[in-house]
Amino acid sequence: DSFEMVFDFSDADFSGEPQEKSTALERGIVTHDFLGLLDFDKTESIESLKQEAERLVELNLLKPTAPEFIDFDNVLRFFSSPLGERIKNAEEVLREQPFRVLIDADKLYKDVRSSDKILVQGRFDLILKEADGITVLDYKTDRVRGDKLKQRVKDYEPQLYIYDLAAEELFEKKVSEKLIYFLEAGQLVNLKQS
């Protein structure tokens, strides 16, 4: 007999006053949608990124207002980085990959000693499958820097821990890297190094 709980992880970014929260949420959703849909071959310039956004609008994959919420400079900086180049040249990249896995309760809660499983569902922003393991990447659109960014990393660690467990369960392969990329700050944080 086992007890099942469902946790659904979403990564909306909330910060600031109510109006700012609404704008931050919209920016986060639109940016994630854009990163999940864009053609990696269209990431070489601001102009090509804007054209790609317009193409996705024409295909009704993005709302007509979406491009005004995308910071194309930040997206270009990401795809010009070593990680961006690695993603563009990878053999297998999964984007916006949904997951639904059962995870042992004792892996999620320190004080639990049982065989109960917890159903966890969510969506990976990006999975990079490579010979030496899996890289889990989570994009963040938070407008934070310095000490606030360090605190935000700590806030997101539990989410990435769940993603780590879910990816290993789902793909039956070791997670070699858990990455958070803060688009606004242009900063990559590796929470798990092999």
What positions do the PLM features span?
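Structural signature of nuclease core domains in nucleic-acid processing machines
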Residues: 1-194
